[in-house]
């Protein structure tokens, strides 16, 4: 799957769950489960409830995603 096949959306972290998983509320009102990407994990970027994040989703499963960026 190429990079252009992913859907990028913005949302806010609603809740922190075990194993670096987060409940993210998207700007359109939907809530999804999202895990953090490898670069965020590698650089020890902390994500807390209330943070604005960019989420990458696949068109095949719209209930899960990957957090690729934390906005300042």
Swiss-Prot record:
Q: Tell me where it resides.
A: Cytoplasm
> What InterPro entries would the database entry show?
NA-bd_OB-fold, RNA-binding_domain_S1_IF1, S1_domain, TIF_IF1
| Residue ranges occupied by any S1-like domain in the UniProt entry | 1-72
Q: Which CDD domains match?
A: S1_IF1 (cd04451)
SMART domains the UniProt entry points to: S1 (SM00316)
Please state the protein's primary subcellular location.
cytoplasm
| Gene3D superfamilies hit by this protein | Nucleic acid-binding proteins
Give the superkingdom in one word: Bacteria
- Using the record, list the residue span of the signal peptide; answer none if the entry has no such feature: none
Q: Name one GO cellular component term.
A: cytosol
Q: What does this protein do?
A: One of the essential components for the initiation of protein synthesis. Stabilizes the binding of IF-2 and IF-3 on the 30S subunit to which N-formylmethionyl-tRNA(fMet) subsequently binds. Helps modulate mRNA selection, yielding the 30S pre-initiation complex (PIC). Upon addition of the 50S ribosomal subunit IF-1, IF-2 and IF-3 are released leaving the mature 70S translation initiation complex.
Q: Record's HAMAP family?
A: IF_1
Q: How does it assemble?
A: Component of the 30S ribosomal translation pre-initiation complex which assembles on the 30S ribosome in the order IF-2 and IF-3, IF-1 and N-formylmethionyl-tRNA(fMet); mRNA recruitment can occur at any time during PIC assembly.
Q: Which family does it belong to?
A: Belongs to the IF-1 family.
Name of the protein in its database record: Translation initiation factor IF-1
Organism of origin: Vesicomyosocius okutanii subsp. Calyptogena okutanii (strain HA)
């Amino acid at each position: 799957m190429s990079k252009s096949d992913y859907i990028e959306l913005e949302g806010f972290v609603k809740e922190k769950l075990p194993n670096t998983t987060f409940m993210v509320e998207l700007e359109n009102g939907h809530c999804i489960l999202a895990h953090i990407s490898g670069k965020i994990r590698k650089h020890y970027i902390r994500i807390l409830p209330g943070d604005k994040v960019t989420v990458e989703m696949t068109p095949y499963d719209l209930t899960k995603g990957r957090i690729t960026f934390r906005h300042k």
